[in-house]
């Protein structure tokens, strides 16, 4: 699956791990800070980041003041279906308001992630 991601400033996913697919991020616009236990790396426009099958716990964040746009490529597919199940649809070409998830939304995402071979970790996972 190929997923276009629009990442607003100061946002990104919580640390997570995929056990059933590999993932690549290609930065189309802007930049994101990728993080694993090994450290942080800034991925800029034109950069490609690969997370292998059953790779490390990872996350990314857009620390810039403008949106970042990424292509997320996963094989085999499944992450796209996860996003359809836990996300909300927005009109094409619009930027969703960045609103923190409710405890109920977090619980639903954690439960649903397991069904798709993912494990989500607390946002402070790398601070420990």
Where is each model-derived feature located?
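Ligand-binding loop in jelly-roll beta-barrel domains
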Residues: 53-80
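A short glycine-rich, His/Asp/Glu-containing loop-to-beta-strand
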Residues: 1-15, 21
């Amino acid at each position: 699956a190929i997923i276009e991601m629009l990442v607003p400033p100061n946002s990104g996913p919580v640390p997570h791990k995929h056990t059933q697919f590999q993932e690549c991020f290609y930065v189309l616009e802007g930049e994101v800070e990728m993080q694993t236990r090994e450290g942080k790396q800034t991925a800029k426009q034109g950069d490609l980041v690969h997370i292998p099958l059953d790779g490390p716990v990872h996350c990314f964040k857009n620390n810039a003041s403008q949106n970042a746009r990424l292509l997320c490529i996963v094989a085999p597919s499944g992450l796209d279906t996860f996003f359809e199940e836990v996300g909300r649809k927005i009109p094409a070409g619009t930027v969703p308001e960045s609103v923190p998830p409710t405890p109920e939304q977090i619980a639903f995402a954690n439960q649903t992630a397991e069904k798709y071979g993912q494990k989500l970790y607390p946002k402070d996972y790398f601070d420990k």
